[in-house]
Amino acid sequence: MKRLIILLFAIGITAMSSMSMAAMSNSRVRKETRFLTDKMAYELNLNTQQYNDVYEINFDFIYSIRYLMDDVIRGYEWALDDYYNYLDVRNDDLRWVLSDSQYRRFLGLDYFYRPIYANTGGWNFRVYITYTNHNHFYFPKPYHYRSYSGGHYRTHFHNVSYYRGRYNHSHYRGN
């Protein structure tokens, strides 16, 4: 009887952790990334190259924080620090892709600049507050929607932005 209870408990724990992990599968990361990037392209008037690069940057960010956010909600300080590090990398990479005027507009829109909000009930993307139709897209999928898997993240480039120097427009310099 004791073994049966322990076995059922172990199965229950495994099922709950699997459901938590399944909450942000790779396909969901791609879907969330596409939705956020599509709205950024629409509001910031991105060209095709920018659209594809912003998709990569958003993918890297969402992929990196997808399981971390549960620990942020639990109140772990290390998780919050990690979250803000990932957010800083994302926003700095975007600085190299967006023009000065696009980046200034980006800074003024919380649902782009700080795309995730958390409360005691969980976490979600701010963009869904403004854009309530989750199935409406202004643009087709990025050309590498199914194939991109993080190859341009900073750890692959000695912690230097892959996007630095790829564009010839003026960049936001913080002034």
Language-model features, listed with the residues they occupy:
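Low-complexity segments
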Residues: N26-D38, Y42, Q49-N175
